[in-house]
């Protein structure tokens, strides 16, 4: 699959901010189109927001902040129920 994609819709997202509201990590459940495929797909996007805007860089986050980000995404219903059930099985 080509890396070039266009976000059609952000369905839900969880966010964790640090160093003020301008810097945040997000997990988004979104519908996207890839440039080499004409079908919309629902995906999870892990994003870094710098200065309030999506940064074109890797999201690098320490484990404690990741737990806070994951909790925010969970509380915001980013994950489908079947995904939550699969995660519960992994964590047992």
Segment roles from a protein language model:
Residues 23-59:
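A short, structured beta-strand/loop element
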Residues 15-18, 34, 53, 66-68:
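Generic "edge-of-domain/loop-turn" microfeature
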Residues 51-92:
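Mixed-charge, Lys/Arg-enriched low-complexity segments
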């Amino acid at each position: 699959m080509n890396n070039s994609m266009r976000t059609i819709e952000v369905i839900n997202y969880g966010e964790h901010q640090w160093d003020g509201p301008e810097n945040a990590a997000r997990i988004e459940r979104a519908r996207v189109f890839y440039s080499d495929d004409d079908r919309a797909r629902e995906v999870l996007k892990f994003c870094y927001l710098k200065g309030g805007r999506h940064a074109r860089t890797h999201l690098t986050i320490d484990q404690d902040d990741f737990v806070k980000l994951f909790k925010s995404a969970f509380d915001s219903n980013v994950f489908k129920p079947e995904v939550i059930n699969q995660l519960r099985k992994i964590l047992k």
